[in-house]
A protein has these predicted regions:
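Short alpha-helical donor nucleotide-sugar binding micro-motif in glycosyltransferases
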Residues: 262, 270-276
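Short hydrophobic beta-strand element within catalytic cores of glycosyltransferases
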Residues: 301-304, 314
Length: 383
C-alpha cells in the first residue's frame, strides 16, 4: 500500500505530535507499506518544497508556509495533487485534526482515497473553543473513513461530537532506551546538583498548558523544607517565555532551576531523568504525554495531574501519584507524601509504572494495533 501521511508537525520540529508522527510513519513502513510524509515548514520560503528520503520506504516532503493560512492550504493541495500523480496513493493518514487533518480529509474526499484521522488531544480541545474552527473539525470527523484517538477519554469526546466510534491507539515508548539506571555523579556535578539536593523534574516543551506555575510553586514550597532543585529537561516554548520569566522572577527560586534546553538525544534525556527524585507533570490538559511514559519506563517516581489520558496510564498510589487538576496548588503536598514513603514503597510505585509501559505501551504493542487499523481500511471504505 502507498500511504500519504499528512502531519501537523514532524522532526526536526520538537514536541509530542512531531515525535509521534515520526514514530507512527516509520511503524507503518515496517508493516510493509511505503509512506510519503507531507508537512508544512516555517523555515522554507512560501511554496518552496524539499523532499528527503528518510528510509527506503519513507519520504519526507516539506513545503514552506505562506503568510496567510488560506493561501498555504491551497498551495498544499496543489502540491499534494502533483505528488498523488507521481505516487498514486491508496490511503491517507491525517496526523492531528486541525490543518493536517483538514488537508488530508479534503484531498481524500476529492481524490476518492480512504482517510484515517488521528486525534492527538490538543487538536480536539483547541478546535472546540473559539478561535478554533468547530465546523471544520466536525466536517473532518464526519467525512473521514476511520478515526484513531490516542486515548479512551479522547475517543469518548469524539463520540460525543459526531456519534462515531474512534479506535484507541495509545502512544508507545522504547523501554530499552528509557530504562532504570544508576545516578551519574559526573552529570549531576555538571548540572550543579549537590549531594544534599532533592531533585524535582519535568521533561518536554514547557508552556502554560503543562502547568508551568505549579512546577515553580512546588519547587518553592518543597525548598522551604529541604534543599531542592527543579530540573527542566527541555526548553520553554517561545511564546511562553514571558510567563516563565514572571513565574521565576524571584532570584532565590530561579537559581534553583536548571533549564537544559532541547536535548535531541533520547539516551541523554533518559540519563537526565535518572538524576531526578520525582518527575512532575501538572498539566492542565493533555493527550497522552510521551514524557510521562518515558519517566515511567525509567523507573522514576511520577506525580501528575488527571488531565487527558494520564489516569489511563497512572493509578494513584499504585504506579504513581495523581493530583486532580482542581488541586494542582497541592503538588508540593504530594511531593512530601512521596518523599515520606518508605524506600520499598517508592520502589514498588516505580516498578508498577514501568510494568504498565512494558505491558501496554511498547512499540510491539503499538505495531500490532496499527496493523489491525490499516488492515480494516478497505472494509471501512466499502461500507
Amino acid at each position: 500500500m502507498k500511504l500519504l501521511f499528512v502531519a501537523e508537525h514532524f522532526p526536526p520540529e520538537i514536541g509530542g505530535v512531531a515525535s509521534s508522527a515520526a514514530r507512527i510513519s516509520q511503524a507503518i513502513s515496517r508493516l510493509g507499506h511505503s509512506v510519503d510524509v507531507f508537512v508544512l515548514a516555517r523555515d522554507l520560503p512560501s511554496g518552496a518544497a524539499e523532499s528527503t528520503l528518510l528510509s527506503p520506504t519513507v519520504a519526507l516532503h516539506r513545503m514552506g508556509m505562506a503568510r496567510n493560512l488560506d493561501f498555504t492550504l491551497q498551495q498544499s493541495l496543489i502540491f499534494l495533487e502533483w505528488l498523488h500523480n507521481q505516487r498514486r496513493f491508496d490511503a491517507i493518514w491525517g496526523h492531528y485534526i486541525a490543518h493536517a487533518g483538514f488537508l488530508a480529509t479534503w484531498f481524500g474526499v476529492h481524490q476518492r482515497i480512504p482517510v484515517t484521522l488521528a486525534a492527538r488531544g490538543n487538536d480536539i480541545d483547541r478546535e472546540l473553543f473559539p478561535p478554533g474552527d468547530f465546523g471544520r473539525l466536525e466536517w473532518c470527523l464526519r467525512k473521514c473513513q476511520r478515526i484513531v484517538a490516542v486515548s479512551r477519554v479522547l475517543a469518548s469526546k469524539i463520540e460525543t461530537l459526531v456519534d462515531r466510534e474512534a479506535i484507541v491507539l495509545p502512544n508507545s515508548v522504547d523501554a530499552e532506551r528509557f530504562s532504570p539506571g544508576p545516578r551519574d555523579e559526573t552529570l549531576r556535578s555538571q548540572l550543579g546538583i549537590e549531594a544534599s539536593d532533592a531533585v524535582l523534574g519535568f521533561s518536554g516543551e514547557l508552556r502554560a498548558k503543562k502547568g508551568l506555575p505549579f512546577l515553580v510553586q512546588a519547587l518553592r514550597e518543597t525548598h522551604q523544607r529541604q534543599p531542592t532543585r527543579l530540573l527542566l529537561i527541555g526548553e520553554v516554548r517561545q511564546q511562553d517565555r514571558g510567563e516563565y520569566e514572571r513565574a521565576t522572577a524571584d532570584p532565590a527560586i530561579k537559581e534553583r532551576i536548571i533549564l537544559t534546553g532541547h536535548i535531541a538525544d533520547a539516551d541523554l534525556v533518559a540519563q537526565h531523568m535518572r538524576q531526578v527524585d520525582a518527575m512532575l507533570f501538572p498539566s492542565l490538559w493533555e493527550g497522552m504525554p510521551n514524557s510521562l511514559l518515558e519517566a515511567m519506563a525509567c523507573g522514576v517516581p511520577v506525580i501528575a495531574s488527571d488531565a487527558g489520558a494520564i489516569p489511563e496510564v497512572l493509578t494513584d498510589r499504585v504506579s504513581g501519584l495523581v493530583v486532580p487538576r482542581t488541586h494542582l496548588h497541592q503538588m508540593a503536598q504530594r511531593v512530601d507524601e512521596l518523599f515520606s514513603m518508605p524506600g520499598d514503597t517508592r520502589v514498588g510505585l516505580s516498578e508498577a509504572a514501568r510494568n504498565v509501559v512494558l505491558r501496554e505501551h511498547s512499540p510491539s504493542v503499538e505495531l500490532t494495533r496499527l496493523k489491525a487499523i490499516l488492515e480494516a481500511l478497505p472494509e471501512s471504505v466499502r461500507s
